[in-house]
């Protein structure tokens, strides 16, 4: 069975499922999924959540538990991957998938598991917010999910548990979407995104008391403005 995938989209979409996995390690060939979570979004509003632990049928290494906090005792009575994946694929349907670093990590685990356990391929189109963040916020020294959350003043408590990461990722994606839409409306085709000369963040065009102006997207940490 082919592991063929959908297209990667560097854009904002209004309807999507943001998802995240926790695993026993970094290799989709030799490591296992131990948690799957997803949040279904319609027109920017969360309408449904999915989350489950997964029994990997092998001990979870301490190196994984140290990162995500998931222990062997927690997954002892959890569903096996075959059943968890079947439920998750039903949840996502043919929605566009959104996640952070999913192009290189999560989707490889998902495709490998679906092929091995269910004989299915996952062909949903997807948006990787890591790629999108590098386009929208090139000035950031790092583009981890927690880096984006801190940049946008979004709570990072509970990071590295799948559902918490989904919540954080969804909020960050909506912020990135605002940057993209603003840039699309206020720059000519092929023109670079306008950036703040003080901190390097993208400038957003806003309407103020005295008319339109450009303001830094990192407000209130940076209060740079200029006339539009």
Would you name each region that the model predicts?
Residues 161-174:
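Acidic, divalent-metal-coordinating active-site segment for phosphoryl/phosphodiester hydrolysis
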Residues 1-111, 115-116, 120, 138-143, ...:
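Conserved non-catalytic scaffold segment of RNase H-like nuclease domains
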Residues 220-228:
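Short metal-binding segments enriched for Cys and/or His
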Residues 146, 193, 213, 219:
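Residues immediately within or flanking Cys/His clusters that coordinate Zn2+
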Residues 196-199, 216:
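Short cysteine-rich clusters marking metal-coordination/redox-active sites
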Residues 126-143:
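Short alpha-helix plus adjacent loop in nuclease-associated cores
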Residues 208-213, 227-228:
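Short cysteine/histidine-rich zinc-coordinating motifs and their immediately flanking basic loops
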Residues 179-193, 206-209:
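Short, flexible, mixed-charge glycine/proline-rich loop motifs
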